[in-house]
Design a protein with these regions (language model features):
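C-terminal catalytic/motor cores of large multi-domain enzyme assemblies
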Residues: 1-149
């Protein structure tokens, strides 16, 4: 969204928040939907290294469609409210995963729980659609072995 018009992107460039000594920057992984998990991990590591070294170019931070912000590395365990980076219309916040007792219908068993927070511009994304996206993401994360194939 640019304030007056909705711009539908035909690509999926995903930004991720990177904490540096100079402040927060958001490098962008281009065409993330066309890359394997390994390629995504390698590219994120390379961009994060450039960010830490202060060597990101302006083009490394342009064109994002969606941003992921993780405070888990800073020890934040509960959900937080990430702020959408305009002109994007959504951002996913990820907190620190912890093992918690979860009732499985018969007993409590230890389960890894990952708090997620999705913020989105309601002028563009209907609340129910946002909730369905988050539910889809949770199901994908619960079946990581399938995602990694």
């Amino acid at each position: 969204a640019n304030g007056e018009h909705l711009i539908l992107k035909k690509y999926r460039h995903i930004g991720f928040a990177a904490d540096t000594d100079a402040g927060l920057v958001v490098p962008v992984v281009r065409d993330a939907d066309r890359k394997s998990v390994r390629e995504l991990a390698d590219e994120c590591a390379a961009l994060a290294g450039k960010a830490r070294d202060g060597k990101l170019a302006a083009d490394d931070m342009k064109g994002g469609c969606f941003t992921i912000s993780s405070l888990g590395g800073l020890g934040i365990r509960g959900a937080f409210t990430p702020i959408v980076n305009a002109p994007e219309v959504a951002i996913l916040g990820i907190s620190r995963a912890t093992v918690q007792p979860v009732w499985n219908g018969r007993e409590f068993s230890p389960r890894l729980v990952l708090p997620l927070s999705l913020s989105y511009d309601h002028r563009v994304i209907d609340g129910a659609l946002g909730a369905r996206f988050l539910l889809h993401l949770v199901k994908q994360l619960e079946n990581l072995s399938q995602l990694l194939l």
